[in-house]
Swiss-Prot record:
This is Varicidin biosynthesis cluster MFS-type transporer. The chain crosses the membrane at residues 47-67, 156-176, 183-203, 224-244, 252-272, 296-316, 330-350, 360-382, 392-412, 422-442, 503-523. It is found in: Cell membrane. One of its GO terms (molecular function) is transmembrane transporter activity. Residues 1-33 are annotated as: Disordered. It is a multi-pass membrane protein. Belongs to the major facilitator superfamily. TCR/Tet family. The keyword Transmembrane helix applies.
Length: 547
């Protein structure tokens, strides 16, 4: 009896010693891992240089994006076919940025940090070649093809370009008016070089678990088939929207063929994503999440309306108000400046608000309210509208509303998805951003040209629609006055204003439809941390081993 009792006591003490040893090892291991992660953190001068490099990268990307909005109609001085092939290419090649979801596996490769430098270097030098092109089509083709690769890789880290919009609008306008629009591309050479050096020297990203360790394994993870289907799918859609009712009739065989190909390719792409499961660019488990579906709908609406405003309001300033590109950019600072300020305020409120206030939901509702009112006021623009009303009354309100809601889909993805799915969810939202902008820019362009051509064909002074379209927005008043006389100017400007209001009407519809996404968004605590993966119970394992 005594012997069995002593054996039990010895066994119990040995179990306790083993459990304590296991816990000590686990705690020491966790401490070592924490110390290792802390030692790898970038500090001091390296951190400052890396921050400057990434900031310059955002500046360069914003400059290229803004150049398509403000400088487009000054390019007509060099390229008279801007409303033809050049305009199609600008909307047509935008979906090539849909490479972004397929490039998500690049972040799981152990060499992902230096890999982001190569697109920047190639992109900078090819942008320089754009300035040497003698045809606008070649310039646009090179610019958008290679900017698609650069945006696809660079947006994996700095996904929001809002901080770069304010200085870029003024810088781009000054380049265009005072020097040449080619400086919008030349400036990428020195600034892009600083970014490439900073990232290449100082960024050392750890390889995530489950990531590809070899280049061959990385290629196998890329969704090449889905990407090859997605590109022509959206090209067919945009061509149909671009041609229908303007270049060709809606019942033309070209437009019908594009719509048929779009439908077939869409079914094929969805089938490929279903068959690939989690290995595809669009994992179904992410789309099934309620907040992600709402974020997709919200992003589609917000970016569709924002791209139309950013594109067509500068056109309205240059054509209807007869201002220079520089002054147009300064006027639009009311929108971009308030957008940046609102984004910072909204992000701060979400991160510092009380746990039960669910600030992210209210920021999205603020967007719907403010942008719906602002787009309604913008729709009322006419040749007699004062510049002060445009700046303070409408653009500030629109920018504040857009800035307060633009980041919320990303915050929703970070809140409702697991840590391993955040990159996929964010990439999906960025894909919807570019798709929304591309699709609704094509829709608004179709409405604009159709309305403008219809109004000019019934013009009493015999104004040719082709002449107005080829002239562009910059210098429209002087061109019409020189060819058709002073009496035709006001009528042409009124027709131009009426056609632009069709685009602003699309913004009103998109802004109001985001209320559906507001209702579908879950009320989640955005400050709640992610639940870590459950580690094996050392105490339980030790007992099992002893038994």
């Amino acid at each position: 009896m005594t012997t069995s009792t002593s054996k039990n006591a010895i066994s119990k003490s040995s179990q306790e010693d083993l459990c304590s040893d296991t816990k000590d090892k686990g705690s020491s291991g966790g401490g070592n891992e924490a110390n290792a992660e802390a030692s790898k953190a970038i500090q001091g001068f390296r951190l400052v240089l890396l921050f400057v490099g990434l900031a310059l990268s955002v500046f360069c990307l914003s400059l290229v994006c803004i150049s398509e909005f403000i400088s487009t109609f000054l390019f007509t001085r060099t390229y008279p076919d801007v409303f033809g092939f050049g305009r199609i290419v600008q909307s047509w090649l935008r979906p090539f940025r849909e490479l972004r979801p397929s490039l998500i596996p690049l972040t799981t490769w152990r060499g992902s940090a230096p890999l982001t430098c190569y697109p920047r270097v190639v992109f900078s030098f090819l942008l320089e070649s754009c300035t040497r092109s003698s045809r606008y089509g070649a310039c646009s083709l090179r610019r958008w093809v290679f900017s698609s690769w650069d945006h696809s890789s660079a947006h994996l880290a700095p996904s929001l370009l809002l901080p770069g919009l304010c200085p870029c609008i003024v810088a781009q306008s000054v380049f265009t008016d005072r020097a040449t629009w080619r400086w919008c591309f030349w400036i990428n050479l020195p600034l892009g070089g600083v970014t490439a050096v900073a990232v290449f020297l100082f960024v050392r990203l750890p390889s995530p678990q489950g990531g590809a360790t070899t280049f061959l394994g990385l290629l196998q993870k890329l969704d090449a088939l889905g990407t090859c289907i997605l590109m022509p799918l959206i090209i067919c859609l945009l061509l149909a929207l671009q041609w229908g009712g303007t270049t060709y009739a809606w019942n033309s065989w070209r437009v019908v063929l594009c719509l048929v190909l779009f439908t077939v390719l869409l079914v094929a792409w969805l089938y490929v994503q279903y068959r690939q499961g989690d290995g595809g660019a669009l994992p179904l488990r992410i789309v099934r999440q309620r907040s992600i579906r709402s974020a997709i709908l919200f992003t589609f609406g917000i970016n569709g309306s924002m791209f139309i405003i950013v594109y067509y309001v500068p056109i309205w300033f240059q054509a209807v108000k007869d201002v220079t590109a520089q002054q147009s950019g300064i006027n639009f600072l009311a929108c971009s400046g308030s957008m940046s300020v609102a984004a910072i305020i909204a992000g701060t409120l979400v991160s510092t608000g009380e746990e039960k206030q669910h600030q992210g939901q209210w920021r999205i509702f603020n967007y719907t309210t403010l942008v719906s009112i602002a787009t309604g006021l913008i729709w009322r623009y006419n040749p007699a509208t004062s510049t002060a009303y445009c700046r303070a009354g409408t653009l500030v309100m629109f920018g504040f509303g857009a800035g307060s809601g633009m980041q919320m889909p990303f915050i929703a993805a970070q809140t409702v998805l697991s840590a391993s799915d955040i990159s996929l969810g964010s990439s999906l939202i960025i894909l919807i951003q570019t798709m929304g902008g591309a699709v609704f820019l094509a829709v608004s362009q179709n409405l604009f040209q159709s309305k403008l051509i219809g109004l000019l064909e019934s013009h009493p002074y015999g104004v040719e629609p082709e002449f107005i379209l080829d002239t562009g927005a910059s210098g429209l008043r002087s061109a019409v006055q020189h060819k058709y006389g002073t009496k035709a100017v006001e009528t042409v400007l009124q027709a131009y204003n009426t056609a632009l209001r069709q685009c602003f009407l699309v913004c009103i519809v998109l802004a109001c439809l985001t209320i559906i996404a507001d209702a579908g968004m879950e009320w989640k605590n955005v400050r709640a941390g992610k639940k870590p993966a459950k580690a094996p119970d050392a105490h339980h394992e030790s007992k099992t081993d002893i038994k």
